[in-house]
Regions:
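SF2 helicase/translocase ATPase core recognition
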Residues: 164-201, 241-268, 376, 380-462
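Conserved helicase motor
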Residues: 83-100, 119-124, 149-154, 332-336, ...
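Conserved Walker A/P-loop ATP-binding site and its immediately adjacent core
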Residues: 52-74, 180-183, 333-334
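Inter-lobe coupling linker of SF2 helicases/translocases
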Residues: 116-122, 128-138, 151, 156-167, ...
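Conserved pre-motif I regulatory segment
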Residues: 1-28
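Conserved Helicase C-terminal RecA-like lobe
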Residues: 1, 30, 34, 38-50, ...
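Conserved motor-coupling elements within RecA-like helicase/translocase cores
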Residues: 92-115, 361-376
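Conserved P-loop NTPase motor "coupling/switch" region that bridges the ATPase
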Residues: 53-54, 74-80, 86-103, 107-110, ...
């Protein structure tokens, strides 16, 4: 009888039992349900039942390496090791190079059961081939976390990762479909449920059209995707298995300040003058980023315009929340916006996590927010702080700007709304009235419908309609 160091919830025991009888599957429980504990205990069972030598955890998001390291130590008596770990003279941990990771794999028999690396390691052909060979006898189980983040089948890391073929494969994601069924291809391919090429997969499930017939304008045969997922996916959402406090969503609208408004419409005019170039560009949304930045913090774009209605509103929300004994989590898409947020919130002993913060320091910032009473606010980018962290000390979440899709939005919110949450979470989306902010707010909920894998042939707006919609 296996003894667990941390007692799982009943639904987690169900997941562990499912994993005992399936060796190629997708654990797609919603954010905050506790997927990592289930995966760790399945690996522990396999170790103690079959005397397997190693389980490799591959992180689709690099910063998750340290979360997994802490989770293994927290929930088991086994040790974990991040491949390539080396120390500076100061004692600080430094990220390992491919050479150092390969050196570690040469002495794999001396390493602990749980090995951890990031998906980018597989960009190295030597590393990918080494893992492929080790999967024959040493590495009998691979856990691939946030595998949906590996989207491009033509990339070197995808090709390298797909070579790994251990006895037991467990893919994990809280968001099995982000923007389209194409995001599932690598997951299905690795688990052995898809034998066709990416081109064939795309032709079968996508409706092609638009300029030259190369644009995906919709989806078809979605019932086949659903049937496949039913065979190999276990998914429970928080609302079904955990009695958590409610989430309250508040759309907070502000009017742009005079100079801010002038700059905004100057940018709109510039875009409209080059509208054909924008529409024909590979990524028209990128051309509109300046508008989004202007509604957040115009100082990114102009040395003479620093006023921001959204920043003023954010300060107001934080001040009220902190006075009521609450902690706040503030998100933005852009590091420059987070820096200005931090400048305005210095009095709250702010923690921060952006792409500029080293992975090893992110855990310290997370710990600061969770454990220090004096730290009232944590500020970060959606890309760096929106996954893999537990921020349940926060009960107020503020979006200075929203991501392009609803899955990323909910993923970020669920840093606070997960196991351990004891209070209601209030989520503010601050938007400038009559601007691109409102249009994106509408857009992410429209795209969210696609992510539910329910409707056959949902059509996306073509580029012209999309740009005109966002500028309207």
């Amino acid at each position: 009888m296996i003894e667990f160091k941390t007692k799982p919830f009943d639904y987690q025991l169900d997941g562990i039992e499912y994993g005992r009888h399936n060796n190629r599957w997708l654990l797609a429980d919603g954010m905050g349900v506790g997927k990592s504990l289930q995966a760790i205990y399945i690996a522990q069972i396999n170790k103690e039942k079959y005397n397997w030598k190693h389980c490799l955890i591959v992180c689709g998001v690099n910063s998750l390496k340290y979360n997994w390291y802490n989770e293994v130590n927290k929930h088991t008596d086994y040790s974990a090791y991040i491949l390539g770990t080396r120390y500076k003279r100061s004692g600080a941990v430094k990220a390992g190079s491919t050479k150092e990771k390969l050196e570690d794999l040469l002495k794999i028999d001396e390493l602990p059961y749980f090995l951890i690396t990031n998906i980018e390691s597989f960009r190295s052909v030597d590393f990918a081939n080494k893992i492929k060979n080790l999967c024959k006898n040493k590495i009998k189980m691979v856990i691939a976390d946030e595998l949906h983040a590996c989207k491009n089948p033509a990339s070197q890391q995808a090709k390298g990762f797909l070579k790994s073929n251990p006895d037991y494969k467990l893919a994990m994601t809280g968001t099995p479909l982000m923007n389209s069924p194409l995001d599932l291809f690598i997951i299905l391919k690795w688990l052995g449920y898809e034998n066709h090429s990416f081109y064939q997969f795309k032709q079968h499930f996508c409706v092609m059209g638009g300029f030259g017939g190369y644009q995906v304008i919709g989806y078809k045969h979605m019932e086949q995707i659903t049937d496949t997922l039913d065979m190999m996916m276990l998914r429970r959402v928080k609302e079904d298995v955990i009695d958590l406090p409610d989430k309250m969503y508040i759309d907070s609208y502000v009017d742009m300040l005079p100079k801010q408004k002038t700059l905004y419409y100057d940018i709109v005019q510039q875009i409209q003058e080059d509208i054909d170039k924008v529409i024909l560009s590979p990524s028209p949304l990128a051309s509109l980023i300046r508008l989004r930045q202007c509604t957040g913090y115009p100082g990114i774009l102009s040395t003479s315009v620093n006023e921001s209605a959204k920043l003023d509103k954010m300060e107001e929300i934080v001040k009220e929340a902190v006075s009521n004994g609450e902690k706040c989590v503030v998100f933005s898409n852009w590091t420059n916006v987070t820096k200005e947020v931090c400048n305005r919130l210095k009095e709250y002993n702010t923690a921060t996590i952006t792409g500029e913060v080293k992975d090893v320091d992110r855990t310290e910032q997370e710990k600061k927010f969770m454990e220090e009473d004096a730290c009232k606010v944590i500020v970060g980018t959606i890309g760096a702080m929106g996954t893999g962290l537990t921020l349940t000390a926060g009960t107020v979440v503020i979006f200075m700007d929203e991501p392009w899709n609803s899955a990323l939005f909910e993923q970020a919110v669920d840093r606070t709304h997960r196991i351990g949450t004891t209070k209601k979470v209030t989520v503010y989306s601050i938007m400038c009235k009559d601007t691109i902010d409102e249009r994106i707010h509408e857009l992410i909920y429209q795209k969210g419908k696609i992510s539910e894998i329910l409707i056959d042939g949902v059509k996306e707006k073509n580029k012209t309609e999309l740009v005109n919609f966002l500028l309207s």
